[in-house]
Regions:
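N-terminal secretory signal peptides that target proteins for export/translocation
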Residues: 1-23
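Sec-dependent signal peptide hydrophobic core
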Residues: 21-33
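Cleavable N-terminal signal peptides
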Residues: 33-34, 44
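Short, glycine-/small- and polar/acidic-enriched structural segments
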Residues: 47-194, 198-204, 217-221, 226-227
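Pocket-lining segment of extracytoplasmic ligand-binding domains
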Residues: 107, 186-277
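Secondary-structure end/capping motifs
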Residues: 241-323
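Conserved C-terminal helix/tail region of periplasmic/extracytoplasmic solute-binding proteins
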Residues: 311-349
Length: 349
């Protein structure tokens, strides 16, 4: 008896129902497989994640371009990109409110030393970058005695950078110069403009904004050439273990976003304009020029730069004294991607 024959007896009816049931099951299984494949390939059932970035500067651009270019969708990821200032982004990652974060090595190292289950898995900035700007009446670092110097938040990169600056000029933090939190990098320049502080840390595009406001460049930290883990991607080891394919896809999309940033100026400036909410073309041009020359092409973190952070922290944190830089990173995803020839192919042309 064939499935499409009309059953004549009770036995044939039972056989017909059984075969029909198996046919329905086969159809449902095929549909489920199709849905799964759609999700994996970036269709309507793509894996949703929340990604936090910790600063409003052009050094954060790789995930923005990865999203705007469709690279994240290409790897089956639907990402909600959220600005969470400074160390708050690391706190959100630890709490499980976001799945990945782009933060600084400073906030990450502090969290790991405090026992957080977090690792650095990629990086775009491995050198200390930044500038100290002051109000026009301040002509030398020594004139900051008795004044206030703004950072984003304690434990952030700007905090470490300011400490390096003060040490260089023999100024004692909170004795000679009061270091105050402003919340974020744009807020530092706003406070500087209003005279609420006399100096502050800045990175592009805020450096251009400070110049246009007539502020004085007091010290260029970029000239020091310090190896320091700056902008990096972090994840909890739990999420990496449970969602490794998602993390791998994200890093591939991230690397493609980085590639497009370095090779496509016009598109990159459009994306920066959207995320930074800045219309001034000169400011955007300056930011692009600065970061396109500073960001790493292949996003490996710097163990030397992590060691620098650990050594700085060891003065106040005993747990940092015997810490190994290797324990702060998980390079397995990057190594897997590199072994496949992905980076070679990406930068081939």
């Amino acid at each position: 008896m064939k499935l499409y024959d009309r059953p004549q007896t009770l036995l044939e009816c039972r056989i017909f129902v059984r075969r029909l049931s198996w046919l329905v099951i086969d159809i449902l299984l095929a549909a489920a497989l199709t849905i799964a494949l759609l999700g994996f390939s970036g269709g309507v059932f793509a894996q949703s994640i929340k990604f936090g970035y910790a600063a409003l500067n052009a050094g954060q651009v790789a995930p923005w371009i990865a999203k705007e270019s469709g690279y994240l969708s290409k790897y089956g990821i639907e990402a909600d990109l959220i600005y969470i200032p400074a160390v708050a982004a690391t706190q959100a990652l630890i709490a499980g409110e976001i799945q990945l974060a782009q933060v600084t090595g400073v906030s990450t190292a502090g969290a790991i030393l405090a026992g957080a289950d977090v690792r650095i898995i990629a990086s775009v900035q491995n050198k200390l970058a930044g500038t100290i700007y002051a109000r026009p009446e301040i002509t030398s670092p020594e004139q900051l005695k008795g004044k206030m110097l703004g950072i984003s938040r304690f434990g952030a990169l700007s905090d470490t950078a300011v400490s390096i600056f003060l040490q260089r000029y023999g100024l004692k933090r909170n004795t000679d110069v009061a270091v105050v939190q402003m919340g974020g990098l744009p807020e530092i320049i706003t406070a500087l403009e209003r005279g609420a502080i006399q100096a502050g840390f800045a990175n592009p595009p805020q450096t251009s904004r400070a110049k246009k406001l007539g502020m004085r460049q007091l010290f260029d930290l970029n000239t020091l050439g310090v190896d320091l883990q700056q902008t990096c991607v972090t994840v909890t080891t739990k999420y990496l273990r449970e969602r490794r394919p998602v993390v791998k896809g994200f890093i591939q999309a991230y690397a493609e976003g980085l590639h497009r940033f370095i090779t496509d100026r016009d598109f990159s400036i459009k994306v920066m304009k959207k995320y930074l909410r800045i219309d001034d073309k000169d400011i955007l041009d300056d930011a692009y020029t600065f970061y396109s020359e500073k960001l790493e092409k292949i996003p490996y973190p710097t163990l030397k730069g992590i060691k620098f952070i650990i050594d700085e922290m060891a003065e106040k944190n005993p747990q940092a004294k015997n810490a190994s830089p290797e324990s702060f990173v998980d390079l397995s995803v990057l190594q897997e991607i590199e072994k496949s020839g992905f980076f070679t192919q990406l930068w081939k042309n």
